[in-house]
Curated annotation (Swiss-Prot):
Classification via SUPFAM superfamilies: Translation proteins SH3-like domain (SSF50104)
Family, per entry: Belongs to the bacterial ribosomal protein bL19 family.
GO cellular component: cytosolic large ribosomal subunit
Disulphide-bridged cysteine pairs: none
Gene3D superfamilies for the chain: 2.30.30.790
Source lineage: Bacteria, Thermotogati, Thermotogota, Thermotogae, Thermotogales
GO MF, one example: structural constituent of ribosome
Listed name of the protein: Large ribosomal subunit protein bL19
Length: 115
């Protein structure tokens, strides 16, 4: 058995069911936080601006406009145990795989909806 096959077998156990989404989609990510001995869930909603990597190491970047119009970006590992669930709120229609140009645009961004 080669090392590559061994890695694939181990990764199969780690992969969990996640909805299909692409850059331009608006998603709501529920993240688990541990504060002392309590555990709570916090939602982070924004536009997916990039997907990178493959397999268990796949990550995605979500950007939203926070308080006072300041942009907030978070990079989430797709199969991390801290992610409780991912909901796709809106499907966006874009022509780029990486939406880094949204960083330079001030205010709210309008992305056409995909059917």
């Amino acid at each position: 058995m080669s090392m590559d096959n061994l890695i694939r077998i181990i990764e199969k156990d780690q992969v969990k069911e996640v909805p299909e989404f692409r850059p331009g989609d608006t998603v709501r990510v529920y993240v688990k936080f541990k504060e002392g001995n309590k555990e709570r869930t916090q939602a982070f909603e924004g536009i997916v601006i990039s997907l990178r990597g493959s397999g268990v190491g796949k990550t995605f970047t979500v950007r939203r406009i926070g308080a006072n119009g300041i942009g907030v970006e978070r990079i989430f590992p797709l199969y991390a145990p801290i992610i409780e669930k991912i909901e796709v709120v809106r499907r966006g229609k874009v022509r780029r795989a990486k939406l880094y140009y949204l960083r330079n645009i001030r205010g709210k961004v309008k992305i056409k909806e995909r059917r």
